[in-house]
UniProtKB/Swiss-Prot annotation:
Record keyword tRNA processing present: yes
InterPro entries recorded: PsdUridine_synth_cat_dom_sf, PsdUridine_synth_TruD, PsdUridine_synth_TruD_CS, PsdUridine_synth_TruD_insert, TruD_catalytic
Highest taxon of source: Archaea
Keywords, ordered alphabetically: Isomerase, tRNA processing
Molecular function GO labels: RNA binding; tRNA pseudouridine(13) synthase activity
Alphabetical list of PROSITE patterns matching this protein: TRUD, UPF0024
GN (gene name): truD
Active-site feature positions: 83
UniProt organism field: Thermococcus sibiricus (strain DSM 12597 / MM 739)
GO biological process, one term: tRNA pseudouridine synthesis
Family: Belongs to the pseudouridine synthase TruD family.
Function: Could be responsible for synthesis of pseudouridine from uracil-13 in transfer RNAs.
Protein name: Probable tRNA pseudouridine synthase D
Cited NCBIfam families: tRNA_TruD_broad
Length: 422
């Protein structure tokens, strides 16, 4: 199953016909620029660099930089992961001894697809320490660009009346060709480490390098043969296979992966469940831009959702809350399930509990007692995307879109609602 098949399970918010087209035909068609808070620079503890990268996953780029300058990659911090199939600008912090020596080493660094610019000193960066991202996206392959422009206007007009774009987690959370991350996450959550390993190592599409090796491993379970056949670029798969050969434990094999990588599986499953809840709310005709009794809403400050400041709507507070929603001071949320999740009541609460029942999961499972490093407390996430500075125009290449999104919000989900390509 590819991401188009996967996302066909989730409802569009607008009914207007999409414009089709293709994003990411070239890396320069998808440009991302990270925005971090100024408070990061209120320290001289670490070196702060702006990385420009192309055809590199964030974690792989950080490991390569650390290896070249001779430090542990754990001393390199970052605020957000960025797409490989794009040109991305993001910040990293380097916190270690002999910072001046490291600075000299970086000045002479030459890595294809990566450039680094020193921007100052600051605090160690951690995942989530960003405000958001600016995007520039070129949509190519349009049959009739002028008609596409008119359709875009119509879609945007409809979405404005409905409060924004549906805030689905994007394809990067699940995998674009092997859409399995959420399935691996569910198996890990249930403590089925062997099943999760077979899914991660053995699932194949039929048209990717390494598929024959995956297919053979799924059939035979032969670890020695897999180590001979799995290509070197499948470094995480190979790391797991080596660890399993050493320990005969798939749990320990998952634990050998870098923590940000292995947590992707649980995050992906949480994201799938959120998307399912959001889609069902749309399907049932419930507003995303008007609170219902029992809904949980989050505060909004300077146009940005404060996801950890939430309150439950009652019949008594309903009118007051919806006045705040209209003023842009609050937003209706959906569930990011975890062991400390606060579920909604009313119609949304019914949806949330139905999904937990359908999936056969208990919130306490997110404590991940067998592998506590994967524990997830959960939280809430706004149901709508309200892009800032949204602009678009026609060009020789196609349609060019520019906008800013808060952290954790996906540009691909904005484009999906306009393209409707699945």
């Amino acid at each position: 199953m590819d991401y188009k098949q996967f996302f066909s399970n989730f409802r569009y918010l607008s009914s207007s016909k999409g414009i089709g087209g293709k994003i990411k035909s070239k890396p320069e068609d998808f440009i991302v620029r990270e925005v971090i808070p100024r408070s990061v620079f209120r320290s001289d503890q670490c070196l702060i660099y702006l990385i420009k990268k192309q055809n590199w996953e964030t974690m792989a780029a950080i490991k390569e930089i650390a290896k070249r300058i001779g430090i542990d990659y754990k001393n390199v911090g970052f605020a957000g992961t960025k797409d490989r199939h794009a040109i991305t600008y993001q910040y990293i912090s380097i916190c270690s001894e002999n910072l001046e020596s490291i600075k000299e080493s970086i000045a002479s660094l030459n890595i294809e697809g990566i450039s680094l610019k020193f921007v100052g000193r600051g605090k160690p960066l951690k995942l989530g320490m960003l405000i958001g991202n600016h995007f520039q996206i070129i949509l190519r392959g349009l049959e009739d660009p002028e008609r596409a422009l008119e359709r875009t206007k119509k879609i945007l007009k409809e979405l404005k009346l409905k409060g924004g774009f549906p805030n689905y987690f994007g394809s990067q959370r699940f995998g674009e060709r092997r859409v399995i991350n959420h399935e691996v996450g569910k198996l890990l959550l249930k403590g089925d480490f062997e099943g999760a390993a077979l899914k991660f190592l053995g699932e194949y599409t039929g048209d990717m390098t390494g598929d024959e090796a995956r297919k053979d491993f799924l059939k035979t379970g032969d670890v020695e043969k897999a180590l001979e056949e799995f290509p070197n670029f499948l470094r995480y798969e190979r790391a797991m296979l080596y660890k399993y050969r050493e320990t005969r434990s798939w749990k320990k094999a998952f634990a050998v992966l870098p923590r940000p990588i292995v947590r992707i599986f649980i995050h992906s499953y949480q994201s799938y469940l959120f998307n399912k809840a959001l889609s069902r709310r749309i399907e049932e005709g419930l507003s995303l831009n008007e609170a219902l009794s029992g809904d949980i809403v989050c505060q909004v400050k300077k146009g940005l959702p404060i996801r950890n400041k939430t309150f439950k709507v009652t019949e008594r507070s309903l009118k007051f809350v919806n006045e705040r929603v209209k003023r842009g001071e609050a937003m209706v949320t959906g569930p990011v399930f975890g062991f400390a999740s606060r579920l909604a009541d009313g119609p949304m609460g019914k949806i949330e509990r139905e999904i937990l029942d359908e999936e056969g999961i208990d919130l306490n499972g997110f404590k991940m007692k067998q592998l506590p490093i994967l524990a997830e407390a959960g939280g809430r996430r706004e149901l709508l995307i309200k892009p800032r500075g949204f602009k678009y125009k026609s060009s020789e290449e196609g349609l060019i879109f520019r906008f800013f999104l808060p952290k954790g919000v996906y540009a691909t989900s904005v484009m999906r609602e306009i393209m409707k390509d699945h």
